[in-house]
A protein has these predicted regions:
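Patatin-like phospholipase
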Residues: 1-19, 27-308
């Protein structure tokens, strides 16, 4: 909603940084998606399946399907060698297989076009991931765009982390949930418009697993922008979580209307304008020049010859 309102008022976007959900939205815009394109994707049934990990029935092997149960997860033991029983808990709530495949489809063409340099996207872009072993943020501005976004949104226990440059990368919000410092250090913009849709973890609740995990892993973030640096828009959502994509329209409208209410102030700080038709044309040219996605080789790991 914020992006749509700014575009409609000819406010230019020169750089984008984002963490977690901000990395998803920011990366889509950075690789040439319009607000309409992003809304169509996020509203689609396909997207709901990707972030929930559900498999379409036509792709399920019915003879291997388990009997439906209300269980949250289960643990299986193999007593063939009772001295080496090693029970394993699930690594994530959401099965990552569909999301991993879809991120290749979504981001591979833009990665190829920019040759792994996020400064060469339609809009230069950075996102943040977390190295929990070394207790530090990772600023991602090069490499595979899909992997960067996938890492930035990998909140512990919800989504499985991925490995980037031999580092297990988690959600960037653990150490930096509002990367205005990265925006300043990497891009040196004249004005920053910051959108805050999160807050530092509140006191954990006895029956709320997510609030307990947040308090265990997330460091406090400075959600402020000095007036001399930019404009801050803060949204308080007490009952919205990482997977609430069903409330997209509600959240879009809140962001859109709030941005319009601040438009006079924004225009007073940002004097340069861009022509909407010119932006659409540049976006069309950029998207049309993206290479086609072809799979030349497929490597299968962890399977025997019969399984392959």
């Amino acid at each position: 909603g914020i992006i749509r309102a700014l575009e409609e008022n000819n406010i230019p976007f020169d750089y984008i940084t984002g963490t977690s959900m901000g990395a998803i939205i920011g990366s889509l815009y950075a690789m040439g998606y319009s607000p309409d394109d992003m809304e169509a994707l996020l509203r689609s049934e396909d997207f709901k399946r990707w972030y929930s990990g559900k498999v379409e029935p036509k792709y399920a092997y019915y003879f291997k399907k388990s009997i439906p149960t209300p269980e949250f997860f289960n643990i299986r033991f193999d007593f063939k060698d009772s001295l080496n029983v090693k029970p394993q808990l699930p690594t994530s709530m959401v099965n990552p297989i569909q999301m991993n495949l879809v991120f290749v489809e979504l981001f591979a063409r833009a990665t190829a076009a920019c040759d792994g340099d996020f400064d060469r996207l339609f809009v230069p872009f950075r996102c943040i991931a977390s190295d929990v072993y070394n207790k530090r943020q990772i600023v991602l501005g090069k490499g595979d765009l899909g992997d960067a976004v996938r890492a930035s949104m990998s909140f512990p226990f919800v989504f499985k982390p991925i490995e980037i440059d031999s580092v297990l990368a988690y959600d960037g919000g653990i150490y930096n949930n509002f990367p205005t410092d990265v925006m300043r250090d990497d891009f040196h913009p004249d004005i920053i418009i910051g959108s805050v849709v999160a807050a530092n973890p509140s006191k954990p609740k006895e029956n709320d697993l997510m609030s307990q995990i947040e308090n265990m892993v997330m460091q406090k973030t400075d959600y402020s922008i000095p007036d001399s640096v930019g404009i801050l828009m803060t949204f308080k959502y007490d009952d919205v979580n990482l997977l609430d994509f069903d409330r997209l329209q509600e959240l879009h409208d809140i962001g859109y209307n709030r941005t319009l209410s601040l438009m006079d102030s924004i225009k007073g700080r940002i004097h340069r304008r861009v022509n909407a038709d010119n932006v659409r044309l540049r976006r069309l040219v950029y998207r049309s020049n993206l290479p086609q996605l072809y799979f030349q080789k497929i490597y299968i790991d962890g399977a025997n010859s019969q399984q392959q």
